[in-house]
Amino acid sequence: MTKKIILPSPAKLNLFLYITNKRVDGYHELQTLFQFLDFGDDISLEVNESGEIELLNAIEGVAKEQNLIYRAAKLLQNHTACSKGAKIGVTKRLPMGGGVGGGSSNAATVLVGLNHFWQTGLSLEQLAELGLSLGADVPIFVRGFAAFAEGVGEKLVACQPRESWYVVLKPNVSISTAAVFQDPNLPRNTPKRTLSRLLSEEWTNDCEKVVRDHYFEVEDLIAELLQYATFRLTGTGACIFAEFESEAEAKAVFAHKPHNIFGFIAKGQNRSPLHQMLNLTTFPQ
């Protein structure tokens, strides 16, 4: 492979998020549902025989060794003793700190893409275990299927929720995930429910009230758009989203977003666009 290959690095949404327990070690147990979107960043890969990992887009103020894309490539290279190299670029569309998985998705696309084109031969499950050291959400993107997660997020069950259309908006604020989970008003004892029951109920997010109470930018945007649609938080934010049956309905609401707010329209995908492109089996048999 000498030509440049462009691979999708999709966004994800947490369609619901419930916190069921805080353990003695400080970790929170949860129930959440991840789904991919047909919108995201693009990762370019150009594999070569140099043995070097070259980043074509440096992030200002971030050392190469701290860059998740570089770390993912080096991790796979070292783990498999691969002698090949690559030039890697990224076209960013997803907002930083939006809670839609940009950095984790980038790392996963690099792992999956280089494993494919370097022919290093790891299974998706092996790649997911490797990716966990890069971030808790990386295995979600590596496995490539919409998933119901329990525990501290490590127990995954393949799931096929409806593939709706979404409007996703990014309030002009950064939210500290750690601060949200440390907040004394965060619910921590939501009763556990079966997946079948959860799929039949209206979905909410236990973090949303805490975030709306502390960040007026989120509260005001949700309130301003309430006359058009009900938006809710994904993860700990800052992004919010609303669900629609058709692209036309989504476009009609998107037209009412404030001009200074970043946003996009996307369709839910139960199979990652990356895995569709590479024709990788993703749903457990």
UniProtKB/Swiss-Prot annotation:
One Pfam family hit: GHMP_kinases_C
The keyword Amino-acid biosynthesis belongs to this UniProt entry's keyword annotation: no
Coiled coil: none
Reaction(s) this enzyme catalyzes, per UniProt: 4-CDP-2-C-methyl-D-erythritol + ATP = 4-CDP-2-C-methyl-D-erythritol 2-phosphate + ADP + H(+)
Binding site for ATP: 95-105
Record carries keyword Translocase: no
Gene3D superfamilies: 3.30.230.10, GHMP kinase, C-terminal domain (3.30.70.890)
Gene Ontology annotations of biological process type: isopentenyl diphosphate biosynthetic process, methylerythritol 4-phosphate pathway; terpenoid biosynthetic process
Keyword tags: ATP-binding, Isoprene biosynthesis, Kinase, Nucleotide-binding, Transferase
GO MF: 4-(cytidine 5'-diphospho)-2-C-methyl-D-erythritol kinase activity; ATP binding
Pathway per the UniProt entry: Isoprenoid biosynthesis; isopentenyl diphosphate biosynthesis via DXP pathway; isopentenyl diphosphate from 1-deoxy-D-xylulose 5-phosphate: step 3/6
Source superkingdom: Bacteria
EC number, as in UniProt: 2.7.1.148
Catalytic residues, chain numbering: 12, 137
Function: Catalyzes the phosphorylation of the position 2 hydroxy group of 4-diphosphocytidyl-2C-methyl-D-erythritol.
Family: Belongs to the GHMP kinase family. IspE subfamily.
NCBIfam families the record matches: ispE
Protein name: 4-diphosphocytidyl-2-C-methyl-D-erythritol kinase
Native organism: Actinobacillus pleuropneumoniae serotype 7 (strain AP76)
